[in-house]
């Protein structure tokens, strides 16, 4: 299984963009494109539906050594051997999420300011999502942070930080130039004509030495 510290490209499998029946194919395409870890985000689905899907997807991701993270519902980690859970600002505390999971899992947290990122690390987050960097339909209520805060957040916290929000191959170079080492991509990846090819192009920018 890949270590979090080695992960650079975080693929978000958002069922707002992908049909539940297409989720396994998209997951395999992400893996073919060398995505480092994958999050299942299913805001409009029941916990039972997510449990069933996460179980199927985990067979695929675990065989490839790619961690699978579930969004919001820490209790799913008690039923499916996923590697982690991801929390928003309005979700459970990290301690409560770990208790619900009932075992050691990675716990990440979405943050929308430097202060929230610092607090998430203090609370014990294994990684943070930092954004939205650019305007994005997945976070319409949040003002874009822009590029200027990226370097500062990397200077202030030590846990892996994944920049997120409106990041696509066309602006990824700007995000990296602003100090990002890791990114999470949602619609850019999911809407790509060839998901694997798109992911590989992103990884080439994130890992120029390879």
Model regions: which residues?
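Conserved N-terminal beta1-alpha1 strand-loop-helix module at the mouth
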Residues: 1-92, 99-126, 142, 152, ...
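Short, glycine/charged-rich beta-strand-loop motifs at protein surfaces that mediate ligand recognition
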Residues: 137-141
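Paired acidic/hydrophobic, glycine-rich loop segments that form the ligand-binding mouth/hinge
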Residues: 85, 183-184
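Conserved cofactor-binding/catalytic machinery of classical short-chain dehydrogenase/reductase
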Residues: 149
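C-terminal binding/interaction regions
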Residues: 178, 182
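Glycine-rich beta-strand-to-loop/alpha-helix junction loops that act as flexible
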Residues: 130, 162-167, 185-187
């Amino acid at each position: 299984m890949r270590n979090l510290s080695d992960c650079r490209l975080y693929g978000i499998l958002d069922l707002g963009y992908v049909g539940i029946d297409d989720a396994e194919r998209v997951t395999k395409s992400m893996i073919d494109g060398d995505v480092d870890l994958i999050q299942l985000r299913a805001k409009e689905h029941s916990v039972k539906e997510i449990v069933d899907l996460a179980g199927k997807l985990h067979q695929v991701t675990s065989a490839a050594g790619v961690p699978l993270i579930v969004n919001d519902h820490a209790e799913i980690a008690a039923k499916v051997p996923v590697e982690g859970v991801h929390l928003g600002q309005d979700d459970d505390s990290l301690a409560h999420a770990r208790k619900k999971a009932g075992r050691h899992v990675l716990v990440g947290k979405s943050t929308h300011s430097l202060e929230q990122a610092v607090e998430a690390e203090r609370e014990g987050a294994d990684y943070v999502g930092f954004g939205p960097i650019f305007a994005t339909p997945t976070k319409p209520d949040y003002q874009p942070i822009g590029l200027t805060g990226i370097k500062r957040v990397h200077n202030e916290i030590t846990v892996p930080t994944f920049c997120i929000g409106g990041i696509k191959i066309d602006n990824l170079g700007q995000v990296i130039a602003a100090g990002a080492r890791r990114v999470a991509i949602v619609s850019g990846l999911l809407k790509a004509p060839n998901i694997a090819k798109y992911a590989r192009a992103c990884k080439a920018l994130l890992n120029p030495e390879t």
